[in-house]
């Protein structure tokens, strides 16, 4: 991704798993906080908890394996948001749901992550107030119809689904 160039240009703090955080520091990223699954990193106004994500993790230069992937439970402004990242469906999402999620951002691309049907199951496990699909339609193997996913979520779970186009935002 673009994490290294963005963090160097902006000075943004990057929160990552320990191995990835160590790698980013070695690449000259100035502000890195490295944690691990189950750990909560607090900052003014909120916190980030690193949670499991079931996927592979690699960096393209020499196919470096920078540790295990993670999802994020972010708390700020009285809201709790789960960013699943690249992952499959897994039963411990039920425990993540106990965090009291306002929003869950879930992959629906299939092929490399869970697809729409499993993402609907994840919504049942997580019980968020709102779900936002991600990680789809960026290249042919992960082509999906996000509006069909929205219909599936709302019909099968009663949870509201918001489809955002690239560059769109949503105020909570």
Regions flagged by a language model, labelled:
Residues 1-25, 31, 98-105:
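Active-site metal-binding motif and surrounding structural segment of the metallo-beta-lactamase
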Residues 1-3, 24-26, 60, 92-94, ...:
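Short glycine-/acidic-enriched loop or helix-start segments at secondary-structure transitions
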Residues 2, 14, 48, 86, ...:
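Divalent metal-coordination and catalytic microenvironments
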Residues 4-6, 29-30, 63-64, 96-99, ...:
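Short, glycine/charged-enriched secondary-structure capping and boundary segments
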Residues 8, 27-30, 46, 67, ...:
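Structured loop/turn residues at beta-strand edges in well-structured enzyme cores
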Residues 13, 21, 25-40, 120, ...:
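Binuclear metal-ion centers of metallo-dependent hydrolases, dominated by the metallo-beta-lactamase
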Residues 35-98, 165-172:
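Core dinuclear metal-dependent hydrolase active-site scaffold
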Residues 74-129, 134-142:
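Metallo-beta-lactamase
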């Amino acid at each position: 991704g673009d994490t290294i160039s963005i963090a160097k240009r902006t000075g943004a703090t990057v929160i990552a798993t320990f191995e990835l955080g160590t790698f980013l520091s070695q690449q000259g990223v100035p502000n890195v906080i490295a944690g691990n699954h189950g750990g909560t990193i607090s900052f003014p106004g909120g916190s980030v908890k690193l949670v499991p994500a079931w996927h592979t993790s690699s960096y393209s230069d020499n196919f470096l394996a920078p540790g295990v992937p993670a999802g994020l439970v972010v708390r700020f402004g009285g809201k709790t948001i789960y960013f699943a990242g690249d992952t499959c469906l897994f039963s411990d999402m039920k425990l993540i749901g106990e965090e009291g999620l306002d929003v869950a951002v879930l992959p629906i691309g299939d092929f490399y992550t869970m697809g729409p049907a499993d993402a609907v199951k994840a919504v049942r496990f997580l019980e968020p107030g709102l779900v936002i699909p991600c990680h789809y339609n960026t290249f042919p193997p992960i082509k999906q119809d996000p509006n069909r996913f929205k219909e599936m979520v709302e019909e099968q779970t009663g949870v509201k689904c918001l489809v955002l186009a690239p560059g769109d935002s949503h105020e909570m």
